[in-house]
From Swiss-Prot:
It comes from Psychrobacter arcticus (strain DSM 17307 / VKM B-2377 / 273-4). InterPro entries: DnaJ, DnaJ_C, DnaJ_domain, HSP40/DnaJ_pept-bd, HSP_DnaJ_Cys-rich_dom, HSP_DnaJ_Cys-rich_dom_sf, J_dom_sf. Signal peptide: none annotated. It comes from the Bacteria. GO terms for molecular function: ATP binding; heat shock protein binding; unfolded protein binding; zinc ion binding. The keyword Metal-binding applies. Its main location: cytoplasm. The J domain is necessary and sufficient to stimulate DnaK ATPase activity. Zinc center 1 plays an important role in the autonomous, DnaK-independent chaperone activity of DnaJ. Zinc center 2 is essential for interaction with DnaK and for DnaJ activity. This is Chaperone protein DnaJ. HAMAP family: DnaJ.
Length: 374
């Protein structure tokens, strides 16, 4: 274990009070706890390092010794407390019921029982399903309690006995450098129990892979990336151990008309040059049916028109968003000779009319160019 400065490990100054030390340790413990970082091999070392730093800096006596002598104060074991303290005491002081946060029980005297792993399932929804809510049936394979032994892991209840290595505590004290730390018992896996005659079907694990089908209720207003938690529907934890949770993650398929940004929906409304110039009432689709919007005379391409209350009501709110319509003026193609002649005549009338500002963006553009070279 690296002998980094304890203040540096927790990220606090040497004048930090106990509240600052506790707050810094809590943040690191939440970040690096092994139960939250099963795929990060370095997390456990960082967690232990932070715990050691907190054990010293939270004790007035040990902190004073560390400030005077540094790590040398503990070369022969932790002073005063005899052997480095109990991490359960630290957790109880900092987090209260630590098991509620990390899914495992650390209660006094009992075995250390790990909960089943959480599972993740990605479900695809249409925009309409996400906005209105729906029920979906999902199927997956995951560890579930063994039918043969009812999840006990043993042929008979009498085959489950107290672990003789940890005496039912689920933890053993291990010496690591100049600290003594509590670790899960390697013989019983932290349960405090051992099985004399394991179930032949699950080999004592209490769980077996099974295919499952569940109906999931998707609440109205979910968005891409939102998760629906199904408590206790995750991986079975084994004999006498709490199940993990199932997280159903939403993926919303792209829509051919609408895009969503928070509570608002966006869409393009294509109109002709003549409709933009003369103005027109245009019928557009919404998720609640068709509505008509007024395109004002002289509307420019890119203009945003807001239709209030035609958006989405997100989860956990009652405020419905709007539908934002972006006007897209389409330039005509494949014109006939007659149409081209008419357009040229129309253009001539624009060029010859100096009294009216009929092309505001064009006039503004050329004025800016002129200002640039003046």
């Amino acid at each position: 274990m690296s002998k980094r400065d304890f203040y540096e490990i927790l990220g606090v100054s040497k004048t930090a009070d106990n509240k600052e030390v506790k707050r810094a340790y809590r943040k690191l413990a939440m970040k690096y706890h092994p139960d939250r970082n099963s795929d990060d091999p370095d997390a456990e070392d960082k967690f232990k390092e932070a715990s050691m730093a907190y054990e010293v800096l939270s004790s007035e006596e040990k902190r004073s010794a560390y400030d005077r002598m540094g790590h040398a104060a503990f070369e022969n074991g932790m002073g005063g407390g005899g052997g480095g303290g109990n991490f359960q005491d630290i957790f109880g002081d900092i987090f209260g019921n630590f098991g509620d946060i990390f899914g495992q029980s650390r209660g006094g005297g009992g075995g250390r029982s790990r909960r089943g792993s959480d599972l993740r399932y990605v479900i695809e929804l249409t925009l309409e399903e996400a906005v209105r809510g729906c029920k979906k049936e999902i199927s997956f394979t995951a560890p579930a309690p063994c039918d043969t032994c009812d999840g006990k892991g043993a042929k008979n209840a009498s085959d489950i006995v107290t672990c003789q290595t940890c005496h039912g505590q689920g933890q053993v004290r291990m010496q690591q450098g100049f600290f003594a730390v509590q670790q899960a018992c390697p013989h019983c896996g932290g349960t405090g129990k051992q099985i004399k005659n394991p179930c032949s079907d699950c080999h004592g694990n209490g769980v077996k892979d099974k295919s499952r089908t569940l109906e999931v209720s998707i609440p109205a207003g979910v968005d891409d990336g939102d998760r629906v938690r199904l408590s206790g529907e995750g991986e079975a934890g084994g004999a006498g151990v709490q199940n993990g949770d199932l997280y159903v993650e939403v993926r919303v398929k792209p829509h051919n008309v609408f895009t969503r940004q928070g509570a608002d929906l966006y869409m393009d409304v294509p109109i002709s040059i003549t409709d933009a110039a003369l103005g027109k009432e245009v019928e557009i689709p919404t998720l609640d049916g068709k509505v008509k919007i007024k395109v004002a005379e002289g509307t420019q391409s890119g203009k945003l028109l807001r239709v209030r209350g035609r958006g989405v009501t997100p989860v956990r709110t009652t405020m419905k968003g709007d539908l934002i319509c972006r006007v897209v003026i389409e330039t005509p193609v494949n014109l006939t000779r007659e149409q081209k002649d008419l357009l040229r005549q129309f253009q001539d009338t624009l060029d010859g009319d100096s009294k009216h500002q009929q092309s505001p963006h064009k006039k503004s553009f050329f004025k800016k160019i002129g200002d640039l070279f003046d």
